[in-house]
């Protein structure tokens, strides 16, 4: 018997964190990341990425933990659907890209502060600190 293994290499990864699958920036498809993953979970997409999340939100007034936040204000920038939702995690949120082919990549991370409303903003709550690792190297 002959066993054949096919290895599929991907050369791009675009995720709409906390949102539905959308096409933006002309022709780039951002994959859906809309599952209500809980406080301690690993979720794998149907393609080449997954995420792990840990932690409960203990210091807020919400009775159940919500792990996806939706912006309700009007956004005026192009491709605003990419900035409408966000995945939340109280301790750690990690995305993994699987089967990415060897090569040089350009990494673009897009962030939008959509959680605070009224007179509160990100600067009133302190810094946002995160680490980005590529091939086990902190960049």
Report residues per predicted region.
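Compositionally biased, intrinsically disordered or flexible polar/acidic segments
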Residues: 1-139
């Amino acid at each position: 018997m002959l066993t054949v293994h096919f290895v599929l290499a991907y050369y791009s990864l675009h995720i709409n964190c906390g949102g539905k699958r959308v096409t933006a920036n002309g022709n780039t498809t951002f994959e859906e990341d809309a599952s209500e993953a809980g406080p301690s979970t690993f979720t794998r997409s149907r393609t080449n990425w997954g995420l792990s999340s840990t932690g409960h939100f203990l210091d807020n007034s919400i009775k159940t933990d919500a792990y996806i936040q939706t912006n309700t204000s009007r956004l005026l920038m192009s491709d605003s659907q990419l900035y409408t939702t966000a995945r939340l995690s109280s301790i750690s949120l990690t995305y993994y890209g699987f089967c990415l082919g060897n090569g040089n990549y350009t990494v673009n991370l897009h962030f939008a502060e959509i959680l605070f409303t009224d007179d509160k903003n990100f600067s009133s709550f302190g810094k946002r600190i995160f680490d980005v690792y590529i091939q086990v190297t902190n960049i």
